[in-house]
Amino acid sequence: MSAPDRPIEPDNRREARRWMAIVEEDLDVAGAATRLSRFGASAYHVQQAAEKLMKALLVLAGEPFRHSHDLDDLASRISLVYPRFSPRADALRHVSV
C-alpha cells in the first residue's frame, strides 16, 4: 500500500498543517519582497516555500525525512511516495537558490 493509500494519522495531519502555515507565510513574504523589487529575497522565500511544501507532503504521508534543504532529494522522495505528483515535484527541483 503506497503512502497516499494509507489512512492519514491525526498527528501527521496537524504537523502538515503547521508546515503549510509556514509555506503561506513564506509566499506572503516573497510577494512583499517582489513588490519592493527585492527579487533575491523573493527567490529565497519561494525556495523556502517549495521546500516546506514538500516536507509537509512527506509528513502527511508519515514518511521521515532528514534535515535538509536539498530540493532535488525532497523531490525524489515525493516522487516515490506520491507518483502522480512526480511531474510537479520535478519542476520544484529547479527552484533552488
Give residue ranges: language-model regions.
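Terminal alpha-helical segments
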Residues: M1-V97
